[in-house]
């Protein structure tokens, strides 16, 4: 298991995706040193890490995101687990009260900064609704295609930070795509609260990866 650091805001998309893919290529390039089977790679993360994991898995056929070093290695993965991660930046405010939707309808919202980068001086930036193509390109839902690896999606039905609708949309899109996908909704769980650190939840994720990555 490897924990990966990646660039976040003020660095704009696709910086974090390029970092995630380069980390995979680095590990594969050093597979013998680390005792890794580079034909059996899984990615997982929660929140922003879940978003990044989904982006890595859904863009496997898009070499434009493979930048930097170790380009003779593939950044493809064989399994993906996303835990309460965003999947569609265009609808990220769905399922929230009006006051929360007002925050997302802002040039300073985190998802707008991810797509636009930090703005300076007279540049006001853009609402995501003004740049739907860019928002779609920075969303896992914008990259669904045949041949994706198996997915495990997990979300709490009491999440106050990332709406469960985000995982609903991803699950529906993957099902329509014919992708093997499992969707687990954790009752009463909020965003990253103690529900997620229960041993049965941890065991569930470990067993899922074991079942999908064992030879």
Where are these regions (language model features)?
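Alpha/beta-hydrolase superfamily serine-hydrolase fold, recognizing
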Residues: 1-215
